[in-house]
Amino acid sequence: MGFFGRYVRQTAEMNAQRGTLNIMLETEVQSLDPQVATDGTSFEVIADYTDGLMQMDADGAAVPAIAETYDISEDGKTYTFHLRDAKWSNGDAVTAADFVFGWQRAVDPANASEYSYMLSDIGQVVNAAEIIAGEKPVTDLGVTAVDDKTLEVQLNVPVSYFLSLMYFPTFYPVNEAFFNTCKDTFGTSPDTVLSNGAFKLTDYQPAATAFTLEKNPDYYDAAKVALDGLAYQVIKDSQQALMSYQTGALDMTLLNGEQVDQVKDDPEFTSVGAGYLWYISPNIDGVPELANENLRKAITFALDRDAITGDVLKDGSAPCYTAVPPQFATGPDGSDFSADQTKFAEFCAYDADKAKEYYEQAKTELGKDSFTFNMVVDADDAPQKVAQVVKEQLETTLAGFTLNLTVEPKKQRVQDMQDGNFEIGL
């Protein structure tokens, strides 16, 4: 039940003499803990000062980062990463044990990491699913520090896009000794954050609306980092952000659909795939009716993704029919794993007749003629617009279906969904 997001932005031409890049954020950072963070804003900032095993190159391919080289077993189920000489910003060496600790934190039920499934369902790391379910200890996770510079990962089955997952923040390393000195304050200030990436955090506090990062002189690839630093500003009003760009206060700003029409012919306008999904998440564990497959199929076929992307977002976003969005992972041949969306459209593209057919089956199976659900949605402009159209589409196509909307700050919405305190989430 998703569609693919796209970043559209105005970008001033930068060069090595500019010093600091001034960037807009749409929302505050929710968490700087890589295993706890769930939102794109947090991931963007964490990735500015942290490197994982791999990174994405300009063509979207996975290339070495902290891992200098790697080997893949003949059966595709064992990955051995050989780490380069890299340092944390406190002078400690980045070791294989840092990755083991970070990954164990991700699957530890005590941490309730929303993206723990990246290791289990998506990454297929041995014993990840059992650990998340509380059936095995975190020490049974299929990741081993053979020595300080060698990390071995065991998978249940071959995963063709596994290397692409390595630049997702949930897979980032955490220095265990440093973490233990911070505990509950980890990731809340420059003093409780370590960098092993191109930049390091200089001033930040939770819910900050402006903060900076400076170039990390100890970064292994520092010679290739042209900027002296990054300056982030949280600007929630898109028109204010565009004005700040036009006056030179910002070097880069995101645009909404209406603004795209205004500036699309400007040579500084850029449109790039964001590699993320908008999706509707039904709480099938907490709401019995939503566990009914035919009801979920009815909802799926009642959604007109083309109308949402073309008439509401209007920013180049495209309908998506796969759980893995385009530009997110590569397949066995090195090409985009989800580039061809057309072959999946028949399973979930808009079809009012199919939606009504599945809806009637669901009503019979559940013994009900009508349904009322509540959907939580972020308090930002775009999510509210999308939610309103989703409500209209479902209520128009499915007679007797009511979708109420509850608007919450993103942090609260994320927490409610993590706690299972929701019916449907956007």
Give, region by region, the residue ranges found by the protein language model.
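N-terminal lobe/hinge region of extracytoplasmic solute-binding protein
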Residues: 24-74, 194
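Alpha-helical secondary-structure segments
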Residues: 96-102, 148-154, 198, 227-229, ...
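Surface-exposed binding/hinge segments that line
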Residues: 98-100, 114-177
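Gly/Pro-rich hinge or "lid" segments in bacterial periplasmic/extracellular proteins
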Residues: 149, 155-225, 229, 239
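Ligand/substrate-recognition segments at binding pockets and active sites
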Residues: 206-208, 360-426
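Ligand-site clamp/hinge motif
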Residues: 217-263
